[in-house]
Amino acid sequence: MYHSFFFRTFVPSIYFAIIRMHLSKAQIKWVRSLQLKKNREAEGVFVAEGEKCINELCNAFELVLLATPDNATSTEIEQMSSLRTPQGTIGVFRQPASDTRYPTDELILALDGIQDPGNLGTIIRTCDWFGIHDILCSHDTADCYNPKVVQATMGALARVRLHYVDLPQVLAEIKAQGTPLYGTLLEGTNMYGSNAIPDKQHGVIIMGNEGNGISSAVRQHITHPLLIPSYPADAVTSESLNVGIATAIVLAEFRR
């Protein structure tokens, strides 16, 4: 069977230890319950689906349960899945211990109230592409272990660390160290200008909430407000960009 071959090939150390017998009704019910944040937090685990995503996450997280056609029927996998079209494999992983440590000598991202799981997942995946390894998140940012977030990252969660912190306080501390804090604002400086970004290798890039942008508590700490210009400048365009797309545009400029 394809699934057996995949997991024996790519995760051989855990395949036989985890797939021993058919999943019980209690296990199936438990996996389904993990769609709720309170249950994920209580158990200290999260769920991923699809062979590629699971294989990527096995490199960074402890796999505690694996459901495949070898130990669960298609109906049971559908019951456990949070996807409209289940991908046939489901993994439950141990959440790592909370870590508030973050680097201060490289470029990092800060998210202020990003609430849509799809946006957060896309941002994590984009950070992985552009070599951003740490993201500071306000406490009201979406849970990075939400199944929709995990799926949208396509395994990037294995390489990008998220730190849920008191964002205004942490940014104040970083600012006091002389670190530049960049934020996307409508009244910002055109980010393609020659002096808009003095240091592309070091600093914090702040992205705001989908509907309200960067909060006033966070905005006061920005040292370099940036504008993503629309083209042509005097044309009527959309009011704003999707935050995932905006993040990709900004990171691309910093890495250019």
Q: Which ranges hold each PLM region?
A:
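Active-site/ligand-binding-proximal alpha/beta "capping" segment
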Residues: G183-S238
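Boundary-proximal intrinsically disordered activation/regulatory segments immediately upstream
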Residues: I18-L66
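Structured adenosyl-cofactor binding patch, chiefly the S-adenosyl-L-methionine
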Residues: G91, W129, C144, Q151-A156, ...
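Glycine/small-residue-rich loop that forms an oxyanion/phosphate-binding "nest" at active or ligand-binding sites
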Residues: T75-F93
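Short, positively charged and aromatic/hydrophobic N-terminal segments
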Residues: T9-I18
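RNA substrate-binding interface of SAM-dependent RNA methyltransferases
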Residues: I18, P103-G188
